Amino acid sequence: AFDGTGTFTGNLGTATTTVADSVTMTAAYNVLNGKTVNHDGSESAQALVVTIASADAAADLSNITSDITNLTANFSETQTFIGNLDSKTASVANDITVTATAADVTGDTIAAAGNGNIAVTALHSTLAADLSGLSSSTGAVTAAFDGTGTFTGNLGTATTTVADSVTM
């Protein structure tokens, strides 16, 4: 059982891990991948924070089994994310840039702290992308449209660039 708020860096083995009431467990994706982390029998303010470092840029949060409703991700290093947030809310640390295709972040909620940045690529390949859940405190949210197409999605607050000789 995880009984006190903190960061776990060890090996969870094959056992199901439980998180006590009002406790936040933070661990790297490579520690939690393929594991089961649940609340202790009652859902009472537990939280599970999955840290995604650049080495885990292909992280697929659907590989973590959990009945904790407050399961979030935190991008801790600059990276090109090619994974799956599995509809979980994510944050980007201050001064970090996360780059991802529109297909990988459409419909997701990702908030960058301080000067954190979110750079969306291949917007032309996901013409109905919903970027309305992407935000940055004082950094930037950008989107690149590099092929001709009719965009029908939601750009949110993203500053969008359209490549030369391309129509959006």
Report the location of each language-model feature.
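Solvent-exposed, low-complexity segments and loops of surface/extracellular structural proteins
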Residues: A1-M168
